[in-house]
Amino acid sequence: NGFVRRIKWKLVINMRKKNFMNYCGLLGIVALLSYTVAVVFSPLAYPGYNWMAQAVSDLSAANAPSLRLWNQLSSLYSVCTLVCAMMVCAGIQGRGSRTLRLGIYLFTAMEWVSAVGFSMFPLSDSGYAGTFQDRMHIYSTIVVVLLSIISLVLIIIAGIKDKEYRLYGAFAGIALGMMLVGAMGMNIVPKEYFGVVERFSVFAAVGYNAVLGVQLFRIKPEK
């Protein structure tokens, strides 16, 4: 009992030392939960949707029957993701190497391109209908993928060079691995399993944003 009380007291003290920026890091977890709930439950409003074969973006296509439910369930995702990412950029100022900071800045830029690009240009139909809107959706995806890869590689390099930030690099490696599995898997596996490997890619970025948020929460505030 005494040991438990000491642990609780230390937790209380640590929580009191946190500032507003630290707590904003927890929004990364909120974003991950919001996105996960949307991915899991939106198919309930999409008759015939096969999550193993279809992409997540089909759920938010302009004519998808699940669009309304998707928007409701993912309402916290975009705003929490962007607030968390911007706060991480602010919190990393003066910390770590220039490579680490550049990687985080590019990752945040990717989040903005994702939020704005996919909101402005959702798929016009499930799959790919070939319209201008669909082409812009694909271009947004390409930019998001390139920024994701470059940013994660930079963070991995920074983590290798600086042991203090090796957790950033380790989780960036996991996220990059998930993206590569998704990218290569979509061209290798049968169409019946396209949705399975595609989810590795989409959850890699969302998950890593949550990791950055947790790391921000753990950072000791400057006096």
Predicted regions and their residues:
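Interfacial segments of alpha-helical transmembrane regions
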Residues: 23-28, 96-110, 166-172
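Alpha-helical transmembrane segments of multi-pass membrane proteins
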Residues: 33-50
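Interfacial helix-start motif at the membrane-water boundary
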Residues: 59-79
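Hydrophobic cores of alpha-helical transmembrane segments in multi-pass inner/ER membrane proteins
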Residues: 72-84, 143-155, 203-217
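Internal transmembrane alpha-helix with an interfacial aromatic "cap," most often the third helix
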Residues: 76-103, 152-160
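Membrane-proximal helix-loop-helix units in multi-pass membrane proteins
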Residues: 114-157
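Terminal transmembrane helical module of multi-pass membrane proteins
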Residues: 156-222
